[in-house]
Structure formats: structure tokens, C-alpha cells
Amino acid sequence: MTREVRLLGRVQERVKASIERSDGILRVRQSMQRLQACMHERNYKDAAACLKELRDIEALSIPIDVGDKLRMNSAENDIRDAIERQMSAALHAKDEAAVLRLGSIFEPMLFAEEGVSMVLAFVASQLEERLAPSSSLQRLSIHDLTSHLIHVFNTVAEVTLRFEPLMLQSFGSVRGAERLLSRVYNVASPIAVRLLDAYIAQRGLADLIHKARHLPDATGPNIKVAAENAVDWNPQLNEVAVVLQHSQTYERFVRARDVFYMARSSSPTGSLLASFNASPLNTSVQELAALYCALEDVCLSASTKKALATEEMRSIASHSALIPVSSIIDEVFYVARNGACRALATGHVDAACGVLNLVATLLETTLYDVIKSRVRALPREMREAGPLTGLLTNLQSSTQLRDQIQTIATLGKKMTSRNLNSTPPASTNASGPLTPVLAPPVTLNSIGTILSYLAQLQATLEADAMAAFSDPLPAHIKSCLSGLQDAAKGYKALLETAMSHIASVFQPKLASFLSPILKKTSFDLTDAMFAANEVNDPFAASLVTQLRLLLDPYEEHLARETFEQLVDAVTVVVAELLEGLLLTKLVPFNQLGAMQLEKDVRVVANYLGEKVQFNHAHHRAFGTLRQCVMVLNVDVPDDVLEFYGRPTTRGVVDWKLGAGRVIELLQARVEFTTVEIAAIELA
């Protein structure tokens, strides 16, 4: 039984093999008939499909007779010759449909390598003809050089996109698209390098920069003349920036297509392009970028020198009011914004970082040192100068000037006209009168304007960087942009220093005014004395008058925010002065005297508080003094327990007085006995 089953199995296998063989022979016959028909009709696409089917049948070990094999080989040779001729004709005729149709035949015919080589050779020859300069590079003008360089970049992009569908659809197995990109890049790069080198040489950028850096500095009366006749570097900078921008756009296009092709490729090998740093084109572009940064440095330096030489006092709009500032601020920020935005627009990371660093250095060092020197001189200038009331009158009170002022809206976009009838800086010596441009309000307004411009510049550059570079931004660009934030911190600290300098000049004036008055003031009052004080205030009204004399000129000329900062600094001085003169060495107080002190402190605090809208800084400055007054005004010592240790002024100011200080204040009240005070338990 087992033997019969085995025999039956062998019979079945032989029958199955015979059927498969017969089927294969029939398929061979049918394919050969279709192949002959297609070749007769010159339908090479279907003929290639039939030939591929015959090769697949042959791979299954199905015997094909010698005659059929000869006919297959002959058909294959005929198809290759035919499609190569037709492909060449279609390429020269720019027949896109025919190129795609014929390209689809190479893969089934198993000679995609020959096809892609033919296409690449044609593309390379055509590209070389299109990119070749019409004459010697030495004879071309600057305009012709830049135009031809842009033509090179655009032609490479056009050829790549034109043949991309063919390479992806028909030659994917042999990395056709990647090889096309590498071939056109290698053909175009030497031409682009020669054009860039010729442009750099013909422009003479290196010599130009060298001469500009070694120009002798003008002195004396020639400074303004030299500044007015200074070279305008912007046209050349714009031209170089455009060249860099085109080169980087081209490089990004090539690298992006390479990444796209590699993502579609089944081959695990790397890119066929040379690395970015090893590219000869990138080497030339880096040289141009270095020269561009050096030229931007020359432009920034020249513009800054011009701004310093032609400095004047200008008015700008601030909250519907005109405030005086130094013209240096507008000039420096104008060139800084132009240079930084131009550098970002190139799309070249190194060039952008280089110029951003130059701008940061200009703002953090050069401009900062100028303003810092003026801040340091504030105390001396204030002591030597006359009253500020008439110092800036010509600028702020002139109706004719107000009509000529153009409002500065945003940084760099609407600059104050150079034809302003502004007050020019007078020549000064160490003992001369205060120059208007060096007046404290001008210095303070200039710092405030710098902070405002820095914020605008930061926002502008961040937006331009996002437009010029891919998201996320390169780390170097982020780092350079953060330098503006560091500069802002430095100017904020400088503004605080300026405020403290002015307050330190006010402090001895206020102290010398208050000390004689307070020495004669008594706070152990009778009813008659208290009533008399209602008519003739002991010191508060006089102190407010003195503060008004000091602050009114600043209020007239300072920006609102800057003036409020100044008032905050003066408030601290006034509060500490009153606390020191009144409460350090306590005089006797009775109930009426404590009420009188509370009224006087309220008058002074209200005057200063109205200037700053009673902000938190104001409440904190008067916090200790007000808490002392609260302790002095209690009806009985036990009333202290109702507020001791709790925040005051609607929770803005924490309790600042220790238990010992509270006891000292209570002991100053003539009505309270030692026993009553000792009975209080302060935690």
C-alpha cells in the first residue's frame, strides 16, 4: 500500500511538472508572437514588456529553443538601438512627454545604467554650453558678472527640476536623481567659483577695506566736514549682500533636493554631493562673506564717527509730547538695524553672525561707553550748571521747531530728518557752562530711547531671522540675538545709576533745606499750636515747594516713564531723609504732634505719589516712615497689637519695624507711661 502511494505521488509530481512546462512553452510562444508583433509595429514599450516576461520565464528553468533565444537577443538589440536614438532625439527636441515615455523602457530592459549615463551626458553638455560666459571674465563688468552668476544658479535649478520626474520614475534603481544633482552641481560649481573670484577681484573689496581702515582721523574743525563728505557704503554692501543671498539660496536648494532624493532612494549609501565645507563654491562664498563682514564693520565705524562728530539735540515724540534726545541714538540705531537686517537677508549663517556681533559690540561697547561717560559726569555737570529751566527752552518752547519736527515712529523706519532746526552742541571746556546735549534730561531720555529701540530691534531681527533661516533657527544665530538682551540689561543698570546720581545731588540740597526747619519744629503741641500749624505748615508745604523746584524742569523735558523712575529714586531719598531727621533721635510727641507728623508725611507722599500714580515702589519707599507714624498715632499702647507684624498700605508693604523700634516710638509719646508700654507683648 505504501509503495503504491509513493508511486502515485511521483506520478502526480511528473504530471504537475509536465503541465508547468507545457504552460511555460505556451507562454513563450505567446510572448514571442507578441514580441514579433510589437517589433513589427515599432511599439518598443510593449516589446520591452514582452522581452522582460521572456527573461522571467527563462529564469524559471523552462527551456527556450535556440531560435527563440536568437530572436530575443536580436529584439533586445533592436529595442536598445531604437530607444537610444529616440531618447537622444527627444532630449534635443525637449519633448518632455517622449522623454518620460522612453525613459520608462530602460528599467524593464535592464540597461538603466546606460540610459542614465546617456541622459547625464546630454545634460552636462547642454549645461556647459548654457553656462559658458560670452567673453573673457576680465572683460565683463560688475553687473555682467553678477547677472551671469545668478544665471548659473537659476539654470542649475531649472535643469534639476526639469529632469527630476524622469530620474525619479525611470532611473530610481541606479540613483538617477542623485546622480543628476551631483553632475549639474559639479558642472556649475567651477564656473560659479570663477565668477565669484572675478567679482571679488574686480570690486577690489580687500583693498577698499584696507584703505578705509587706514584713513587718517580728522581733527578740529575738519571733523564735521569729513563726516559730511564720508563715503556711502550702503550701495556696495547691498550689492554684496545680494550676491551672498543668491549663493545661499542656490546652496539651500541643492542640499534640500539631495535630502529629498536620498529619502526616496532604497540605497543605504550616503550623499553623492561633496560636503558643504569641502565644496569649492562654499570656499569662495566664505571669502566673500568675510569681506562683507569687514565692509559692514567699516560702514558701522564710519557712521558712528559721523554721528559723534555731528551730534545735536533733537526732539522725538513720546506719548504725544516732544522730548529732547541726542542725535547719536537715531543715527547709530539706523545703521545698526540696516546692517543687521541686511546680513540676515543674505541667508549666510557666518555673515549674519559676524554682523550681529559687530552690531552688539557697537551697542554694548561704543555707544555704551559714550553714554556711560555722560552718566558719570552727571553729578559734576549738575553742580556746575545753572538751573535747567532755561537750558532746553529753545528746543522745547519753539513753535517753529515743533512744526518742523518729524515724529520717529519705529526704529529705523521713520528717522528724524537731518534738516531739523535742532540745537547744535556748543564747544565746552572743563569749566564752561553745561552744553544742552549733555543736560541730564537729554542723557536720561537717550538711555530710555535706547532701551525702547533695543526692544524694537530685537523683535525686528527675530522676525527677519525666522524668514531667512529654517525653523528652528541655527544655534549661532540664537546666541547672537541674545546679545541684544544683554545690552538691554546693561543700559537698564546704567539708567538706574543715572537716577541714583541725580538723587545723590538732590539729597544734600534737601537735607540743608530741611535740617534748619526741623530743628525748630516741635511735636509736643498745644491746641493753639496745632491750629496755627493748619495755617502755617511747619515743613511739608515748604518741602513740596522745594521738590517742585527740583523736579519740574525734569518733568517738562523727560519722557513719562523716565520721569517716573526719577521720582521713585527721589522718593527714596526724601523718605530716608525724613526718617533720619525726624525719627532717628526721637523728640517728644503728644497726640496732636503725632497727628501733625502724619499730616505732613501724607502731604509730601501725596505730592510724590501723584507723579508716579502711587505705584508699588512709591508705597515701599514710604513704608517704614508710614509705619512709624502709625505707631506714634495710637490712642493707647495696646492699639499697636492691631497692626503689628501685618502688611500695611493695602498689603503692598511688609511690616518692617522690629519690637525694639516699636517700643522706642511708644516711649516718645509723652502720654504713655513706662508701665503701659512694658505691658505690651510683641511677638
Residue ranges and their predicted role:
Residues Y44, R337-C341, P516:
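Activation on extended, non-transmembrane soluble regions of large proteins
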Residues R203-N229, R264-S275, H319-I323, M382-S431:
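Intrinsically disordered, low-complexity domain-flanking/linker segments in eukaryotic proteins
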Residues V174-S182, L322-F333, R342-A360, R560-V570:
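Short, low-complexity cationic-aromatic patches
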Residues T2, R6-H319:
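Extended, noncatalytic alpha-helical scaffold/tether regions
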